[in-house]
């Protein structure tokens, strides 16, 4: 298997440590990972496909260093955008901005707001992928509920778009919520002054060993001085299940201390969350 990624790392929206960890595991399993690489040509052959690859830098492909590989099949997976062609009569006059239907939702402002999801046409509402990122099924579902409840005259609790879990169903899985370390440093925050990080490797985790999947890491970023959960990033066999606890913690503005004093059942994968939280305070007990 050859994975071709135009950017400089796989899963570029995830925490860099998680991306690097997944790439290391994939290479160890025999996968060929090509980052900073693009596809310049694809030809169908009798046996499958012939693909031309070239280094990609500064928005350009370096054709002088192109190479060709052959494969049985090719899978194109370069992102998601809302598709609404033929979904409505164009004569309605719905306002479309940057490939999405315009509503009172603005991806640039993820904080909780009393949104209606009204479009530019009275009586017409839009939710989900067609109104912009994040393009996630669980977000679309929640938007639909909030939208309909507001139409019905209720006063639903607004969605906090800064607390949306992201899940990648690879193996091992990847899941995250909140800020990555780079996002914090880009905002001028400094490690050990404004935030601390706790990481817990699953290599010695009892339940992970018993299940035969002890490769991965749980990483928690907590703010200073209060200890609130700023971000959480997981590479693990059950990462998409584990992220729920940390999503709830961030939504309720819980602190690492509150996670630490919560007894986690043993043996469970959720103990890894507890261990990472302890590590963020420098209290991890060596196992």
Name each model-derived stretch.
Residues 61, 68-151:
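FAD-site-proximal beta/loop scaffold in flavoenzymes
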Residues 44-49, 121, 212-215:
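A short, glycine/Asx- and small/polar-enriched loop/turn
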Residues 32, 95, 193-196:
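Conserved beta-strand segments of alpha/beta enzyme cores
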Residues 46, 97-98, 224-226:
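Short acidic-glycine loop/turn motifs at beta-strand connectors
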